[in-house]
Amino acid sequence: VRWQGRRPDTQQGALMNNPLSFSVVALTLFAAAPTTTAFGQAGNLASPAALVEKAPANYKAKFETSKGAFVVEVHRDWAPNGADRFYNLVKNGFYDNARFFRVMSDFMVQFGINGDPKISASWRGARIKDDPVRQSNRRGYITYATSGPDSRTTQVFINYRDNAGLDPQGFAPFGQVVSGMNVVDTLYGGYGEGAPRGPGPDQGRLQMEGNAYLAKEFPQLDFIKKASIER
């Protein structure tokens, strides 16, 4: 975050402003191999404009991970735009097989880049408007990462501690972990801060190369086996 030199950012600006990056993206997409995402869901996920269902006033999303399960309860009145987007992403399998690529035990854990570069590219420009900050970034609260005003897409983070300093920067929580925070606490964070600030995963390469990049260079990262809306 800015007041500590750290913030839950998406590093999209670097990709958007780097023509070489987009050239590499195009090549990667052409050669991308299928992922474990279900065929029908992959078709939906490639069309963000079609996934705009209004979320229930309150709902729970269950995340089955390589370390166990945790449940997030979402309150639409906290952040309507964020809650709606999250509902559609979870419901349609976007987070399935996604890695927890930025884990900082004294700060937060970040995830939300799809492992298929083609799907990831489809969502890069699917931004939603900012919501007013109605809740503080307390421990266990979930919030979108951003790269600036009105830049939220798919990446989210869970606060490991009370991070009230994020509130005036516009980070609007939309839900909280209601069970399994002990699982969230044990997600692998041995790689440290991501590039270019640290030796951890590079978001740009993850966007362009997908999970293959992480599997090769950061094999110990924990991941989401399946995310679903609880009935």
Model-identified regions with their sequence ranges:
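Cyclophilin-like peptidyl-prolyl cis-trans isomerases
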Residues: 12-13, 36-231
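Bacterial N-terminal signal peptides that target proteins for export
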Residues: 14-24
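Short, Lys/Arg-enriched N-terminal segments with co-localized hydrophobic residues
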Residues: 1-15
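Bacterial N-terminal signal peptides
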Residues: 23-34
